[in-house]
Amino acid sequence: MSNTWFTSDLHIGHKRLMEIRNLADDVEEHDATLAKAWDSVVGKDDTVWILGDISSGSTKGQIHALGWISDRPGRKRLILGNHDGPHPMNRDAHKLVGAYWMVFEHVSTAARIRVPLYGDAGGHTDVLLSHFPYVGDHTSEDRHTQWRLRDDGKILIHGHTHSPMILSRHIHRRQIHVGIDAWGRLVSRDEIYDLVNHIHEEEGVHT
């Protein structure tokens, strides 16, 4: 049976992020560590959602990261982040679109998935995917606010913050951070389902 995985902010080949992240001593080791974490769990029929920022954002860095992702198993879907060239915030967003579509079966700025609810009531809830959280950043002020989704009460799975926290409840009670900085690995569908149900039970959300 195939699985679905979630991650964000891989920053393949990105020296500055590697130094901040403290997963490895150099970029090559950092990328190899992430490759091992991916390859050890993802099957060829699995789906991997990457919620943005595959690289440093330079043209060379993006091409390198696309090659790295292409070498990994699974079907890949991308939610664009601010370091990804095809994001419409970038003036030259059109230049690398073709290269991205060679690697990913889906490329967009946001998406929606359906998560089953546990318990006697059953049913499901819709959950949004975006690189950006509703609120929060790794800087003192929220950036790229014009590209963030409007909070209409749905749970949001995101990256971008580089926070070690999975649920930043003091900032927002319906956000799930799937970035490498929080997990150090890919997040499984069942882990997402458990977190969504936990939030749904505690907060009550729009389905």
Swiss-Prot record:
Listed GO MF terms: hydrolase activity
UniProt protein name: Gene 66 protein
Organism: Mycobacterium phage L5
Pfam families: Metallophos (PF00149)
InterPro entries: Calcineurin-like_PHP_ApaH (IPR004843), Metallo-depent_PP-like (IPR029052)
